[in-house]
Amino acid sequence: MVSFCCEVCQDIIKKPKLDQHRSRCHGAYFTCIDCNTTFERTDYRNHTSCMTEAQRYQKGLYRPTKKELKKAKMNGNAVNSKELSPNTDNQNTPAGPTKHSLDENEKDKENKKSKKETVSSPAEQLLALTQNQEISLYKLLKKYNKQASKEDSLDSKEVLKHLAITADAKGNYLVKPITK
């Protein structure tokens, strides 16, 4: 049974009693206790199920039962990759790596090597991400760190050490990498 919290009077109400409470409590809107989703007006009527107690407390460790997986497939809900049991993953994949997958791995390695060789300094890497559009340095650094691995992520101090700002005759500011 799904329970909701009235955000106006802070009462906890089970779903069958929500309509009654809504007529008594003026301007009431509700939040599902299990999934912390807030519902305006009568949107709560469509909310029939959400995460179970096991999902909420176990988070990444939770593995759904076969029954839950079947229900999700029947309802058309997308099941997260974390929720798939490891047995189903192993049954669908072939026993050994195929020649096609090995070729793709080799191509990926070559692409990574060529990317590392072409762009060397952090400033040049950031300038490559701008794609001739105006973007703040903060957003640019955030975008780079999102794409990069943890050991390749950049600190803002390091980036600023490698950048130089110049003004041209028109009064435009140009950001260039410092060459040593």
From Swiss-Prot:
Principal location class: nucleus
Pfam families referenced in this protein's UniProt entry, alphabetically: zf-LYAR
Amino-acid positions noted as binding Zn(2+) 2 in the UniProt annotation, renumbered to this chain: 32, 35, 47, 50
Compositional bias annotation for Polar residues: 77-95
Annotated binding of Zn(2+) 1, by residue: 6, 9, 21, 25
Key words, A-Z: Metal-binding, Nucleus, Phosphoprotein, Repeat, Zinc, Zinc-finger
Protein name per UniProt: UPF0743 protein C215.06c
Coiled-coil stretches noted in the UniProt entry, renumbered to this chain: none
Zn finger (C2HC LYAR-type) start-end: 1-26, 27-51
Subcellular location: Nucleus
A GO MF label: zinc ion binding
Gene Ontology CC terms: nucleolus; nucleus
InterPro entries reported for this sequence: LYAR, Znf_C2H2_LYAR, Znf_C2H2_sf
Keyword Metal-binding among UniProt keywords: yes
Organism: Schizosaccharomyces pombe (strain 972 / ATCC 24843)
Comp. bias (Basic and acidic residues): 100-111
Chain positions found as Phosphoserine: 85
